[in-house]
């Protein structure tokens, strides 16, 4: 299995903001203009919509995957963190790509602020949870792009 360092800094990556009902997905590369939101994947009682995830994976052909690590302010475990780590392990097994975790604290707040700016500029028309999930994934990818050394290996 590839290690975290195996993700080339100039490679295309997919990033994920894992929630209990939706998973925001973004794509990014250091050679491009940062990251952009690309999809929201529904999570059902039996897990994520893997058919939809397979389509996104096939379309973007990433060299690595970046999953948001929902740490608490005091770095304690919580159900959301366990869910994100389980999803990251599934990604690694399914796609045989390097998977890293990056601190996602405040990514949803940052995504909401970006959304508000875009709405004020007339680029967004209404608040949409799906858009925010994917925008939060873009924030996660941008954090990895700006500081890949802060990523951690999947335990």
From Swiss-Prot:
Question: What is the annotated localization of this protein?
Answer: Cytoplasm
Q: What is its EC number?
A: 3.1.-.-
One GO cellular component, as annotated: cytoplasm
Q: Which GO terms describe its molecular function?
A: nuclease activity
**Keywords carried by this UniProt record:** Cytoplasm, Hydrolase, Nuclease, Ribosome biogenesis
Report the InterPro entries cross-referenced here.
RNaseH-like_sf (IPR012337), YqgF (IPR005227), YqgF/RNaseH-like_dom (IPR006641), YqgF/RNaseH-like_dom_sf (IPR037027)
Q: Does the keyword Cytoplasm apply?
A: yes
Reply yes or no: does the keyword Protease apply: no
Look up the record and give one Gene Ontology term from the biological process aspect.
Answer: rRNA 5'-end processing
- Sorted alphabetically, which CDD domains does this protein's record hold? YqgF
Cysteine pairs forming cystine bridges in this chain are none
Among Pfam families, the record links this protein to: RuvX (PF03652)
Predominant location: cytoplasm
Membership in a protein family: Belongs to the YqgF nuclease family.
Q: Which NCBIfam families match?
A: RNAse_H_YqgF (TIGR00250)
Protein purpose: Could be a nuclease involved in processing of the 5'-end of pre-16S rRNA.
Instruction: Supply the name of the protein.
Output: Putative pre-16S rRNA nuclease
Q: Which organism's genome codes for this protein?
A: Xanthomonas campestris pv. campestris (strain ATCC 33913 / DSM 3586 / NCPPB 528 / LMG 568 / P 25)
Task: Tell me the lineage of the source organism.
Answer: Bacteria, Pseudomonadati, Pseudomonadota, Gammaproteobacteria, Lysobacterales
């Amino acid at each position: 299995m590839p290690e975290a360092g195996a993700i080339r800094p100039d490679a295309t990556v997919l990033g994920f903001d894992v929630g209990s009902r939706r998973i925001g997905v973004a794509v990014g590369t250091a050679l491009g203009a940062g990251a952009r939101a690309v999809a929201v994947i529904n999570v059902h009682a039996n897990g994520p919509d893997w058919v939809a995830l397979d389509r996104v994976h096939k379309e973007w052909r990433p060299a690595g995957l970046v999953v948001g690590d929902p740490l608490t302010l005091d770095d304690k475990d919580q159900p959301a963190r366990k869910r994100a780590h389980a999803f990251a392990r599934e990604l690694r097994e399914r796609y045989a790509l390097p998977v890293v975790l990056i601190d996602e604290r405040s990514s949803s707040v940052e995504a909401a602020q970006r959304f508000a700016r875009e709405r004020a500029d007339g680029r967004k028309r209404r608040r949409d949870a799906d858009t925010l999930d994917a925008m939060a994934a873009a924030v996660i990818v941008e954090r990895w792009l700006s500081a890949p050394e802060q990523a951690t290996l999947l335990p």
